Amino acid sequence: MTNSQQQKYNNPVSATLTGIRDLFRKQIPAGTLNPTDRLDGKTVLVDGASSGLGFAVATGLARRGAKVIMACRSGIPEKGEKVKKLSGNTDIHMLHVDFSDIGSIGELVKQIKVKYAPLDILVCNAGIVPKQSRKTKQGLEEMFMVNYFSKFIFLNLLLENQCFNEVDPPRIIFVASESHRNPEKFQWDEFGKYKEYQIGKSIELYGYYKLLLTTFSCELSRRLNPNGETRYSVFSLCPGPVNSNIAREAPKIFIPVLKLVFGIFFKSPSKAAIPVVYLAASHDFDGKPFDYLFLMSRKTVDEKASDPENGRQLWKLSEALQERLQTV
């Protein structure tokens, strides 16, 4: 990887320009999302669903007949009512969760197990880009927790509590980013350690945590499908640059410019949701243990993310961190 490639997502300006450029690149679609790709009778959970991409995904899945559970930190119940109106589907439910808090994740899983399991589709969408480092209740760095580690905890709790459909292969979808290609290497010695940073470092760390997430998705697929049989379909994707509120913590001086650029060049959440809905609903992915999309095009993930040794190391460190936090 060249130095210029490494810098693509390392600051807000280069990340924005890269996003705009990627939108204009010619793409070969993996397939087409058809009106007949229905989800009637399926139970879907979308996290981070109160706004932006997550809200659009929840609405899109509801329109296809799914029973939709929106797991959110805010927007309860008004966002669920809005999805009902937009989709014409009344089978919409909202659950509270704060993905920066391990205890809140545990409570969410308890509610899912009692009232909503088995899940057929899970969309892990929640993510943040904070303007500076913040500590969680457990003393972790918040973006590390929300953008990666919460997914590890959440997925393993769902699996331990048998919250997925065990008859038909469920689909687990991670909203990742092409910025996962930017980090030069893993920083295993720093894993889980709290470190101070300001907005200038946020974009770089965002890409690093997306690398952790994409590596986790690859390793999860290998562990859930050990003998070549697809028991779970694990998908990851970059929806491209989205006109959402993920940059809401940017310095105030930049917000008017960002809003203008996002509005002109970036995709609306409803358009950006199409590849997520495609992965959730299309028969094109039946029987597939893993796939990665950029927009609507199939791509291979970065070799660092697909390397089984890196996957095993990430899993080992994540398990050790979870065990340590449980004994505190």
Regions found by a protein language model. Name each.
Residues 1-3:
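Context-dependent free N-terminus signature
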Residues 5-15, 22-248, 324-328:
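Rossmann-fold NAD(P)H-dependent dehydrogenase/reductase core
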Residues 60, 108, 216, 272-276, ...:
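Alpha-helical packing segments of well-folded alpha/beta enzyme cores
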Residues 99, 134, 266, 305-309:
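Intrinsic disorder
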Residues 104, 150, 212, 268-271, ...:
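Soluble or luminal CAZymes and related metallo-dependent hydrolases
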Residues 236, 260-300, 308-312:
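C-terminal helical subdomain
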Residues 251-252:
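Mobile gating loops/cap/lid regions near enzyme active sites that modulate substrate access
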Residues 303-328:
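C-terminal amphipathic/interface module of NAD(P)-dependent oxidoreductases
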